[in-house]
Regions:
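Ligand-binding pockets and gating/stacking loops
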Residues: 1-120
Length: 120
């Protein structure tokens, strides 16, 4: 209900197309329990939900294997997600760098590409 309320509120105020909503965690969860105390982290299969300005609604990109263990169809990296978010915000992700150990690094590394399937 909170996300639906946010979207409804943004639309009623005419702000939905000016806001990018990003919902995701820093990792997924394994589809099975490794121990009796719950499921462990899974960096090979996780979900991201995007809405608002610049996003084509109702689009699904990629899928996990039949067990939900790892991305199997059209996998995307976190670098690609970051590149897409920065692109929608109007920033050139290839020029955004930071200095680390005397070397300029890109925020999206060399793997960052815009996920064009989600763009409106």
């Amino acid at each position: 209900k909170p996300l639906a309320g946010l979207i409804k509120d943004l639309k009623s105020r005419g702000m939905f197309d000016d806001v990018l909503i990003v919902w995701h965690g820093e990792f997924g969860r394994l589809p099975i329990s490794e121990r009796m105390d719950g499921r462990d982290h899974n960096n090979k299969g996780f979900s991201v939900w995007l809405a608002g300005g610049g996003i084509k609604g109702g689009t699904v990109v990629g899928a996990t294997d039949q067990y939900g263990y790892a991305a199997a169809d059209n996998p995307k990296s976190v670098y690609e997600l970051h590149a897409t978010i920065l692109h929608i915000l109007g920033l050139d992700f290839e020029k955004l760098t930071y200095r680390f150990n005397g070397r300029d690094m890109r925020l999206t590394d060399v793997h960052g590409r815009v996920i064009k399937e989600v763009l409106a």
